[in-house]
C-alpha cells in the first residue's frame, strides 16, 4: 500500500486540514466518528482510501495525520469539534506558548522543545504503514509556527526520511489581508530553509482565494472557513488519484517527475474549475472543454500572477467525475492551438493528464455547487516568480531599516541569516528568469551538450 502522512503545522495548517478531512470523509463515506456509513458498507469494496486512513480492529478509520501547533487554541477546537472522535488524540500535539508571528521562535526557541515529540509521533504513524510514500505538509508562510516550525519539521524529515517525497501546501501571505507586519520576513526565511527539503510546493495565495470567493461564489465577506473549503476542494483533487482508482493514476513521485524540471523550480501554479455557486450552477454546462479552458483564466488560479507574462514548463490536468478520455484529448488539442499558452522552447508542449472517475463531493450547505465534473490544473510557469518579487520588495523595504530584526536576533537567530535568505530568494528569481529566457539564444556553441 502506498500510504501518505499529512502533517498540519500552525493555525493555517490545522484549519485547512479540518476542511480537508471533512471533505475526505464525505468522499469516502466515513462518518465523523470514523465508522463507515451504511451506504458505504453496501457499496463494493474499495480500499483506495487506506492511503490516507488506517483501519482499527473494530472497523474504525483513523486519518494518518498529525496536528502540531505551538499554542493550543486551534487544535482544541478540533479536540472538541464535530470530528473529535475521528482523529487519534495522541496525534494532536500542542505547546503552551505560541510563536508570536516570529520565525525564530518557531524554528529555534519554542519550536525546539516540541519537535522531538512531533517526530516521535511521525515515526509512530510511519511504522504503521507498509509502504510509506511520502508526506504532505500544510503550513503558512506568514505565521511564526507555520514558517519557523514548518521549516524545522521539513529539515528533520529530510534527515529521518531522506528518500521519501515531501509535498508542501503553503499559504502565501496576501498583500491585502496581512495578519502581521513581519510576514515578508517569515516567508523569505522559511522559503530559504525549505527550498532544498521540499520536492514540490503548491502555493495558495489568500488574496486570490478571497477574490474567487467574492467573484465566483458571490460571498461578500469571505471568512477563513469559506477559503479553506475551497482550498480543500483543490487539495482533494490533487490527492484524489492517490485515494481512488482512476484510469490514469498519479502517485506522489509522479507530481515531481512531471512538474519539476530543476530541483529549485518546484512551485507549480494551481488552478481549479468550475468554481460556481449553487445559484448559478443550473445555468452552466461545464463541459470538459469549458472547464479546461477556464483553468487558464487568471481568475481560477490560487496565486495572483499573470501566466500570460510567463512561459509554461509543464502542465498537469487532473480531471475527476464524468470525464472520458476522448473529450480530454479534444480539449487538450484545442488548448494547444491557442497561442496564448506559451511553453519554453526546451520543453515539448506536453500535458500530463490524470482522470479519476469519482465525482467531486461538496460539503452540505457549503458555498460550492454540486457539479458532475471538475478539473485541477497544476502548471509550472515562470509567471509565479511575480509572487516572489512582490515579497522580496516588501522584505527590502523593512530590512533596509532593519525594522523588527531585533525580535529575531533576540530569539537566537543571526542577522546574517536574513541576508542569506534574501540572496537565496534573489537567486531563485534569477533561476526563473533564466528558464524563461529563450534557451535557443545561448545554444549556438552548445552542441556538445546533447
Swiss-Prot record:
Cofactor annotation: Mg(2+)
Cellular localization per UniProt: Cytoplasm, Cytoskeleton
Active site: 254
GO biological process, one term: microtubule-based process
Entry keyword annotation includes GTP-binding: yes
Record PROSITE patterns: TUBULIN (PS00227)
Keywords: Cytoplasm, Cytoskeleton, GTP-binding, Hydrolase, Magnesium, Metal-binding, Microtubule, Nucleotide-binding
Its EC number(s): 3.6.5.-
Keyword Magnesium: yes
Superkingdom of origin organism: Eukaryota
Cross-referenced Pfam families: Tubulin, Tubulin_C
Residue numbers marked as site, Involved in polymerization: 450
Main location: cytoplasm
A single GO cellular-component term on record: cytoplasm
SMART domains: Tubulin (SM00864), Tubulin_C (SM00865)
Xref: InterPro entries: Alpha_tubulin, Tub_FtsZ_C, Tubulin, Tubulin/FtsZ-like_C, Tubulin/FtsZ_2-layer-sand-dom, Tubulin/FtsZ_GTPase_sf, Tubulin_C, Tubulin_CS
SUPFAM superfamilies: Tubulin C-terminal domain-like, Tubulin nucleotide-binding domain-like
Residues noted as binding Mg(2+) in the record, renumbered to the chain: 71
One function term, GO molecular function aspect: metal ion binding
Binding site for GTP: 11, 71, 140, 144-145, 179, 206, 228
Assembly, per entry: Dimer of alpha and beta chains. A typical microtubule is a hollow water-filled tube with an outer diameter of 25 nm and an inner diameter of 15 nM. Alpha-beta heterodimers associate head-to-tail to form protofilaments running lengthwise along the microtubule wall with the beta-tubulin subunit facing the microtubule plus end conferring a structural polarity. Microtubules usually have 13 protofilaments but different protofilament numbers can be found in some organisms and specialized cells.
Function noted in UniProt: Tubulin is the major constituent of microtubules, a cylinder consisting of laterally associated linear protofilaments composed of alpha- and beta-tubulin heterodimers. Microtubules grow by the addition of GTP-tubulin dimers to the microtubule end, where a stabilizing cap forms. Below the cap, tubulin dimers are in GDP-bound state, owing to GTPase activity of alpha-tubulin.
Family per similarity comment: Belongs to the tubulin family.
Name assigned to this protein: Tubulin alpha chain
Organism expressing this protein natively: Zymoseptoria tritici
Amino acid at each position: 500500500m502506498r500510504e501518505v502522512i499529512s502533517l498540519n503545522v500552525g493555525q493555517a495548517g490545522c484549519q485547512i486540514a479540518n476542511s480537508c478531512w471533512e471533505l475526505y470523509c464525505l468522499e469516502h463515506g466515513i462518518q465523523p466518528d470514523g465508522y463507515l456509513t451504511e451506504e458505504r458498507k453496501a457499496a463494493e469494496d474499495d480500499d483506495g482510501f487506506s492511503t490516507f486512513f488506517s483501519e482499527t480492529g473494530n472497523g474504525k478509520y483513523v486519518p494518518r495525520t498529525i496536528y502540531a501547533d505551538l499554542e493550543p487554541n486551534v487544535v482544541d477546537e478540533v479536540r472538541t469539534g464535530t470530528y473529535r472522535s475521528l482523529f487519534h488524540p495522541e496525534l494532536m500535539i500542542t505547546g503552551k506558548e505560541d510563536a508570536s508571528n516570529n520565525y525564530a521562535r518557531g524554528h529555534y526557541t519554542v519550536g525546539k522543545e516540541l519537535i522531538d515529540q512531533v517526530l516521535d509521533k511521525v515515526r509512530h504513524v510511519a511504522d504503521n504503514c507498509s509502504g510509506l510514500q511520502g508526506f504532505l505538509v500544510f503550513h503558512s508562510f506568514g505565521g511564526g509556527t507555520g514558517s519557523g516550525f514548518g521549516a524545522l519539521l521539513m529539515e528533520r524529515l529530510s534527515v529521518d526520511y531522506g528518500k521519501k517525497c515531501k509535498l508542501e501546501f503553503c499559504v502565501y501571505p496576501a498583500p491585502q489581508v496581512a495578519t502581521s507586519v513581519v510576514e515578508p520576513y517569515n516567508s523569505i526565511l522559511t522559503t530559504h530553509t525549505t527550498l532544498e527539503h521540499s520536492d514540490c510546493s503548491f502555493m495558495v495565495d489568500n488574496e486570490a482565494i478571497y477574490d474567487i470567493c467574492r467573484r465566483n461564489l458571490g460571498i461578500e465577506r469571505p471568512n477563513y472557513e469559506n477559503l479553506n473549503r475551497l482550498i480543500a476542494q483543490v487539495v482533494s483533487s490533487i490527492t484524489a488519484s492517490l485515494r481512488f482508482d482512476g484510469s490514469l493514476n498519479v502517485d506522489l513521485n509522479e507530481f515531481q517527475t512531471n512538474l519539476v524540471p530543476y530541483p529549485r523550480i518546484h512551485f507549480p501554479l494551481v488552478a481549479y474549475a468550475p468554481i460556481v455557486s449553487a445559484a448559478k450552477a443550473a445555468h452552466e454546462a461545464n463541459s470538459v472543454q469549458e472547464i479546461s479552458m477556464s483553468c487558464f483564466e487568471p481568475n481560477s488560479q490560487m496565486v495572483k500572477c499573470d501566466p500570460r507574462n510567463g512561459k509554461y514548463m509543464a502542465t498537469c490536468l487532473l480531471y475527476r467525475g464524468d470525464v472520458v478520455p476522448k473529450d480530454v484529448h479534444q480539449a487538450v488539442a484545442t488548448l494547444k492551438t491557442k497561442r496564448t499558452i506559451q511553453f519554453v522552447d526546451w520543453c515539448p508542449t506536453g500535458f500530463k493528464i490524470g482522470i479519476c472517475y469519482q465525482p467531486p463531493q461538496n460539503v452540505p450547505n457549503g458555498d460550492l455547487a454540486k457539479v458532475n465534473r471538475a478539473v485541477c490544473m497544476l502548471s509550472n510557469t515562470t509567471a509565479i516568480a511575480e509572487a516572489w518579487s512582490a515579497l522580496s520588495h516588501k522584505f527590502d523595504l523593512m530590512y533596509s531599516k532593519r525594522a523588527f530584526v531585533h525580535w529575531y536576533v533576540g530569539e537566537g537567530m543571526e542577522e546574517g541569516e536574513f541576508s542569506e535568505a534574501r540572496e537565496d530568494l534573489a537567486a531563485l528569481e534569477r533561476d526563473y528568469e533564466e528558464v524563461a529566457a529563450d534557451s535557443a539564444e545561448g545554444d549556438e556553441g552548445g552542441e556538445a551538450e546533447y
